Amino acid sequence: MERTKERASFRKKFIGDRKFYMMVLAVAVPIMIQNGITNFVSLLDNIMIGRIGTEQMSGASIVNQLIFVYNLCIFGGVSGAGIFTAQYFGQKDHEGVRQTFRYKFWMAVILTIGTILLFLTVGENLISMYLQGEGTAQQIADTLKYGKQYLDIMLLGLPPFMMVQIYSSTLRECGETVLPMKAGVVAICVNLLFNYLLIYGVFFFPRLGVRGAAIATVLSRYVEAAIVISWTHRHTEKNAFAKGLYSTLKVPANLTKKILVKGTPLLFNETLWASAMAMLTQCYSIRGLNVVASLNISNTINNVFNIVFIALGDSVAIIVGQLLGAGDMKKARDTDNKMIAFSVMCCTCVAMVMFVMAPLFPMLYNTNDEARELAKYLIMITAFFMPQNAFLHATYFTLRSGGKTIITFLFDSVFIWCVSVPIAFVLSRYTGIHVLVIYACVQLADLIKCVIGFVLVKKGVWLQNIVSS
């Protein structure tokens, strides 16, 4: 009898009805599809470059790791305002949404200009940081050359990427997840087509190798930006915030202050987290160019599978954020519990598939056997820890939806710099431990974050309406 009551209580707390899951999937699936197609094409892009040679693949992957830091800077810059956007939309305050959009615009412009200047001045030095491990002088020189070629072209794609993030994030926070997905699909088709034409020189197109891959990516970003921006302004009946959006670019000082208070820790968090990921890769790269190549393969494959917990985490921010904005705290807590449980269960199933298929993926690349073998085991280790990452991602967005950005800053980037990076740094430089063991130790350390996240979510420190308070 007692056990039956416990089961009923568990089901009520963590398992929703059909209507609940349909609501969650309506938000999550379009994000999954968009990110899934993007990451799948990135995989194909990666394989196409990988078919040319290991040095070309490694050079492009190092640059992508550096640009990833910029991408997350933009994500962090717009996400601080996005917390307010979701809650303003929950209150049907369209002027509030406009003002948060304008804040996003200025923040993204500042970050983009700063990034372009940084890469133009010290880009070659940044690439060289990843070329200090084992490898011949010729291999290192070739990897640096291809990386520099790739970077110079990719910088042209930062402005359209910036605009896509500003518009798409606002649309999603207002409940429109389908259009960004459609724009992403079109852009991906453009990217894939021109990758094929320009990397290999098909028909009358020149054979440009890594430069062709970069040109294709830049073209696709301009196409995506054109679609998202034009659709938003042609459908003002659906996007009320777009009416008079550019009548002024001023942002009220009081709102700017509020967003900065909540958003600056988030911006620092994303920037520090991304730079920590780049630092972790640099630590692993000490063990040689084969490690750089294998990390590139495994990370690309991992990104395809990670779309599930990433989309469900984004859904937590959107759905729970709107409930908090509407002042329904009880429903927000109940919904959050069920969404976290759903994310972990889904990702456990995905991890099993990923683990079984791990030996097959590296065979798609034209690289040496050692790099393939390393990539296989890196994928397996990541699959093993995927349920843990799903829980962490969902708890992170739970805390962020309630404006607890200082806590998320400590929870995320401070932890990775104070725990994960030192583990990788010390083990890679001062021990002979195999790189796979180092990688697993870094993943295992995140169990500490799981405990912290569980306590914070259970306490309900995130249950607040920040746009009213």
Predicted regions and their residues:
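Short alpha-helical transmembrane segments in multi-pass integral membrane proteins
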Residues: 1-28, 85-157, 207-263, 320-385, ...
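Transmembrane helical elements of multi-pass membrane transporters/channels
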Residues: 26-45, 153, 187, 220-224, ...
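Generic alpha-helical transmembrane segments of integral inner-membrane proteins
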Residues: 32, 36, 40, 44, ...
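Hydrophobic/aromatic residues within transmembrane alpha-helices of membrane transport systems
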Residues: 33, 45-49, 60, 85-90, ...
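Helix-terminus/linker motif at the lipid-water interface of multi-pass membrane proteins
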Residues: 36, 40-58, 127-141, 199-208, ...
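Small-residue hotspots at the loop-to-helix junctions and early N-terminal turns
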Residues: 54-65, 147, 151, 214, ...
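Small-residue-rich hydrophobic transmembrane alpha-helices
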Residues: 57-117, 161-180, 281, 292-358, ...
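Short runs within selected transmembrane alpha-helices of multi-pass transporters and secretion channels
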Residues: 78, 153-172, 180-188, 213-229, ...
